[in-house]
Amino acid sequence: MAIATNAGFVELAKHATGTGSPVAWTYMALGTDTGPGNNDNATSTTLKAENTTSNGLQRTATGVTASVVTTTVTNDTAQWVKTFTSTATMTITEAGIFNASSGGDMLVYGELSPTAPMVSTDTLTLTIKCQFKAAS
C-alpha cells in the first residue's frame, strides 16, 4: 500500500495555487529496510533505508515515465513506471517518489510485497500510483 505524505500535500498545494516554487516529482528511489512498519505514515519524509550506492538501484529520474491514468474518474491518478537493472545483490523492500535527486520532498511511500531479491543483471519494473480522490 502506498502512503501519501504531508510534505507531498504541501507541494501539491503549491502546484494548485502556483505559489512558492513547486517542483515536479520525477525521481524514484528504492530502499532495503526490513523493520516492521517501515515508514507507513504521512509524516515520513524519506525512505527508511534508501539505497544510495551506484548499482543500478539508486534514486533516479532517468527512465522514469510519469503519466496520468484513470482509476475511477478520467485522469485521476498519477503514475510512475521505471525498470531498474541491478549490478548488485540486495533485496528491495520499499520505494518512494521524490522531487529531487537527493533530499527533496517525498510524495508517496510504499512497501513492496512481496519483496524483490535482486542479483546482478536482474531487472525490476516498478509502477507507483497516487490516486487523487475525496476522502471516504
Task: List each model region and its residues.
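Small cysteine-rich, disulfide-bonded extracellular modules of the LU/uPAR three-finger superfamily
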Residues: M1-T93, N99-S136
